[in-house]
């Protein structure tokens, strides 16, 4: 029986579909929401304005986006009558962060979208799903 589910979210429509899947298939499970700021993206959070000649129009943008995505995902989950027990914003390699979180928090299942944002990121995030499938020690459901 699945008691806890990790749903990595990125603000894409497939993240919402993953939550919808959880509400249908695991309605009584405790839900963990995870947003991972890619360590490369996080490097842009540095306040470059402190260095002469550099300008950053949005310090902390990646982290702020993560907080917004988590808040939206919580609302979506609660509207689907799911119980959210944790929201985590992590910085690192997305696939490693997802697998590590699933292991450390002893979740029973991971449900995630097959890919996320458009363009080049779509291919990168598609490879994230593949890497999580290969490395996870718990069952993984990929939603399309």
Across the structure, where does each feature detected by a protein language model lie?
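General small-molecule cofactor/ligand-binding pocket signal
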Residues: 32-34, 85-90, 141
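Structural beta-alpha unit
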Residues: 75-110
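A short acidic, glycine-rich active-site loop
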Residues: 52-68
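Terminal disorder- and signal-encoded targeting elements
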Residues: 1-6, 16, 21, 124, ...
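Short glycine/proline-enriched coil/turn segments at helix->beta-strand junctions
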Residues: 25-30, 82-83, 138
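Small/aliphatic-rich secondary-structure junction motif
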Residues: 3-50
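Gly/Ser-rich helix-loop-strand patches that form or flank binding pockets
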Residues: 104-144
